[in-house]
Amino acid sequence: MKRILVGLGTSGHAESVVSHAIEIAQTQGAELLGVAVVDPSRLEWTGPRPIGVGVETLTAELRQDRMTKVAAEIEKANKLFAEKCLAANVPHQTCERTGDPFEIVADLVRYQDLCVFGLHGLFEHDVVPEPTDSLERLVAAGVRPM
């Protein structure tokens, strides 16, 4: 095993995911690829809205707030990943992608031997609810082994 894909979701959950991936990488002599994915279509969807003056402004502010929070979460998770990998002397790279998370991970996994993801906060960075079928969708897309 030489390459491990690590899902960097919410920074709060990233610590255990990164620690687990580092343990595996150390025993196998593997390189880690930390990936953070932003899905703008999910972050921009605000659901049904009332009609009225100022609704568009509030919606735009909500969208901007979500994007700002996601950027901060990704920065924290990437920093944590890099610091822990450096401290453990594990070779690593980071990757940030924008688009459908399931398509992106399915594409990246072709070049990896193992995937390590957390149970929570995989792609939505605690800003919008995580799809309840995330694991099923990853497996259906051919993301293995996890």
Enumerate the predicted regions with their spans.
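Short amphipathic alpha-helical segments at helix-loop
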Residues: 6, 62-66, 97
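Small/aliphatic-rich secondary-structure junction motif
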Residues: 1-61, 141
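A generic structural signal for alpha->beta connector loops
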Residues: 29, 89-91, 143
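Residue-level marker of alpha-helix boundaries and capping positions
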Residues: 8-12, 72, 96, 125-126
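A short acidic, glycine-rich active-site loop
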Residues: 56-73
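Structural beta-alpha unit
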Residues: 39-41, 68, 72-115
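Gly/Ser-rich helix-loop-strand patches that form or flank binding pockets
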Residues: 18-20, 102-146
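Generic structural signal for residues in well-ordered beta-strands
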Residues: 32, 92-94, 146
